[in-house]
Design a protein with these regions (language model features):
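Active-site neighborhoods and metal-handling regions in enzymes and metal-associated proteins
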Residues: 1-344
Length: 344
């Protein structure tokens, strides 16, 4: 799969009449590093690819560390002046750039520079068996943490205390948080189901939404669960939402258009007598794995021709509104003829 992704980049190079593509990675986002070479930057670096060769530009004091991860050629540079090595490597060449490279890194490149982020993102869509196994492990980790969470123990505790508790649990068996843990409770759930924890204390009658994910061996997960304290009406509606959600998942398969997922949710919500007209269709899901939020983020009209493909991994996170609260659940799904829920 990694070679297929590199061939895609080489074809893109020819299509755009480019001589070299630079792929920037840092510790905030190294999805392309993982997808193309299964390496992780020590701080930041560039992978480069031409029609005939490939390699890395790496900070001089991190070269030996990178050698443990790859046999490709490594060009060292000084951490504070990467622009000199980049200008030398690309002299006389038309350059494509992928990733969020700082402008000052590229300022000395003399020829044209083309942003390829939109055109390259498709190489992250399909995962191979190795990647699927790693993403499954990441998904299992966050699912188990949220399963073990006992909301009754946090009455009169703050959202921040819940967030800290979960963050510590995540850090025990993973590289870190996929994103800051979101904890939202009763007062704010009328407006949102994903917000940073506040000093608000959990009451005897309350609703708690937790949105969290882990990074494990470089692969990301994302999951949302709700917990109810003496609020039977909301809990009953949540059970109905989860039932509708499960039926939609059972219909997820390769070839399904993203726009059809919206239709499926509205049909299943209606069967449960839930307010299908309040479904938040613009925040219904996204691809995931190499990073927490990958293309496509759905659904919007510009994506109406996008189909699911086998071995995509997506989240589905239906959210609906009531007068006093919102409800949301979120799971990760491996797209197959019989799709698999990874967070269950």
């Amino acid at each position: 799969m990694m070679q297929k992704r590199k061939e895609y980049l080489r074809k893109l190079m020819q299509k755009r009449d480019l001589d070299i593509i630079l792929v920037f990675s840092d510790l905030n986002n190294y999805s392309y590093d993982t997808a193309l070479n299964r390496v992780k930057p020590g701080l930041f670096h560039y992978y480069y690819i031409t029609l005939r060769e490939e390699g890395f530009l790496e900070i001089d004091y991190l070269v030996e560390e990178l050698k443990f991860q790859t046999s490709l050629k490594i060009i060292p540079f000084k951490e504070d002046i990467p622009e000199i090595s980049l200008a030398k490597l690309t002299k006389g060449l038309n350059v494509g750039i992928i990733g969020n490279a700082p402008f000052w890194h590229l300022k000395d490149i003399q020829n044209s520079i083309y942003d390829l982020n939109k055109e390259s993102r498709n190489i992250l869509l399909i995962k191979d068996d190795f990647e699927i196994d790693k993403i499954k492990s990441s998904a299992k980790e966050i699912n188990n943490i949220l399963k073990r969470f006992d909301s009754s123990k946090f009455i009169r505790k703050t959202e921040k205390e819940i967030g800290n508790f979960l963050s510590q649990a995540i850090m025990k068996n993973s590289e870190g948080l996929a994103f800051p843990v979101c904890v939202t409770s009763m007062k704010d759930i009328k407006q949102t189901t994903a917000s940073f924890p506040s000093k608000r204390k959990i009451s005897e009658k309350d609703i708690i939404v937790i949105d969290a994910g882990v990074v494990k061996e470089g692969f990301y997960s994302d999951c949302t669960r709700m917990y109810f304290l003496n609020y039977k009406e909301a809990e009953d509606n949540y059970i109905k939402l989860v039932n509708a959600h499960k039926r939609v998942i059972s219909k997820i398969k390769p070839g399904l258009y993203l726009k059809e997922i919206v239709k499926l949710y509205k049909e299943e919500l209606k069967k449960e007598n839930l307010p299908e007209e309040t479904l938040e269709i613009e925040d219904l899901g996204h691809s995931i794995g190499f990073y927490v939020h990958e293309h496509p983020m759905f659904y919007s009209s510009e994506q109406e021709n996008i189909k699911l493909e086998e071995n995509m991994i997506i989240t589905l996170e239906p959210e609906i509104r009531f007068s006093e609260y919102r409800l949301r659940t979120e799971d990760m799904i491996l797209v197959k003829e019989k799709s698999e829920v990874l967070t269950s």
